[in-house]
A protein has these predicted regions:
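Amphipathic terminal alpha-helices
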Residues: 310-318, 322-345
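NAD(P)-dependent short-chain dehydrogenase/reductase
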Residues: 168-213
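NAD(P)H-binding glycine-rich loop region in Rossmannoid oxidoreductase-like domains
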Residues: 44, 50-100
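Conserved Rossmann-fold NAD(P)-dependent oxidoreductase catalytic core, especially the SDR/UDP-sugar
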Residues: 94-95, 100-152
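Active-site Tyr-X1-5-Lys
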Residues: 150-175
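N-terminal Rossmann NAD(P)H-binding glycine-rich loop of SDR-like oxidoreductase domains
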Residues: 2-22
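Alpha-helical substrate-binding/gating segment
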Residues: 196-204, 211-261
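Terminal hydrophobic/aromatic helix or amphipathic segment near a protein terminus
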Residues: 256-303
Length: 345
């Protein structure tokens, strides 16, 4: 039996679709307050048989911070896909994020070892990797180094990954994936899908940054292939960057705008403008009580120029990525349908 954590998130929901549409029954861990409606919504992007596949999920109430609920959830489980994590670039969330992501992963590792789980796939992030000084491509061997510029999210993903390496040292067979920025359809109000909504609503600015991007469908396909009987022994106890290609944020925004038939962002957001913007957002947040729409962390992230190599997995198991252009076009098409169908236009 397979257990998926974080099944209501972007990666987890797409993973559940891939597993159930392949005929597999799956356990999925969910907190009591979790809303599974988005899982069905994501299924509907790819099939008319939503209920057929959704019914193959056995939802198990639990929390990665509650070790004993994990013991119960892991009964009969031989493989785990760990997708659960809090993602935030608000400094106020750092303590909560570190506690949830690191302690939660540690709990799951301990429970997996105690229950004899045979295979474990951990969804880490490029945020858990280091940076190169000369601008060369970042690989699996580019190790994380402490820095005051690291975001709370980066810290949480690095130390979460360290929990997995600890588990490996204690005898757990595991594989780690480090996706770049994950593109995919889902809740258009949060995460990377929100970029499509922002451009739809007329985003006017772009930044100087460069980063890696990958389709969520490629992420889950890679995870399943890495856990497959035919290559797990070859790939276990390693990590793999999942990155289809590197692109400037300006090009990324332009491609989204073209896909949505919206104007391209024309104004360059300089360092000075961004610094003023996040300071003003922070001040406004103090008076309104609402969360700032831009933070020091988001400014830092969108200004960095990082290039990532996703070649290790292609060289190891022959994995092939979708092109970034086709991924953006597919997501834009789904977004446009979502914008039209709810209003019946």
């Amino acid at each position: 039996m397979i257990l998926v954590t974080g099944g209501t998130g972007l990666v987890g929901a797409h993973l559940l679709y891939e597993l159930t549409s392949s005929g597999l029954r799956v356990k999925a861990l969910r907190r009591q307050q979790s809303n599974t409606a988005w899982v069905k919504k994501i299924f509907s992007y790819y099939t008319d048989q939503v209920e057929k596949y959704y019914s193959q999920i056995e939802w198990v109430e639990g929390d990665i911070l509650d070790y004993f609920s994990l013991e119960e959830a892991l009964k009969g489980v031989t493989s785990i896909y760990h997708c659960a994590a809090i993602v935030s670039f608000h400094g106020d969330d750092n303590d909560m994020m570190l506690n949830n992501n690191v302690k939660g992963t540690g709990n799951l590792i301990d429970a997996a070892i105690h229950n004899g789980v045979r295979r474990f796939c951990h969804v880490s992030s490029i945020a858990a990797l280091g940076k190169t000084q000369d601008g060369s491509e970042i690989t699996e061997e580019t190790y994380w180094t402490p820095s005051k510029r690291k975001s709370g999210y980066s810290l949480s993903k690095f130390f979460s990954e360290m929990e997995v390496w600890r588990g490996i040292e204690e005898g757990l067979d595991a594989v780690i994936v480090n996706p770049s920025i994950i593109m995919g359809p889902g809740n258009w109000e949060i995460g990377s899908p929100k970029l499509f909504q922002s451009i739809w609503k007329g985003l006017k600015y772009y930044t100087k940054g460069i980063s890696g991007f990958v389709d969520v469908r490629d992420v889950v396909k890679a995870m399943i292939l890495l856990m497959d009987d035919r290559q797990f022994e070859q790939v276990k106890n390693q990590r793999f960057i999942l990155n289809a290609g590197n692109m400037s944020y300006q090009d990324f925004f332009n491609k989204i705008a073209d896909g949505l038939d919206k104007p391209r962002p024309r104004n360059f957001a300089s360092d000075v403008k961004l610094h003023i913007a996040w300071r003003m957002a922070q001040t406004a947040s103090f008076f309104t009580g609402k969360r700032p729409i831009i933070t020091r962390e988001t400014v830092s992230g969108t200004n960095q120029k990082n290039h990532y190599s996703g070649e290790k997995i292609t060289q190891t198991i022959g994995f092939e990525y979708r092109s970034l252009d086709s991924s953006i076009a597919d997501i834009a098409e789904i977004f446009l349908k979502d914008m039209v169908l709810p209003s019946g236009k």
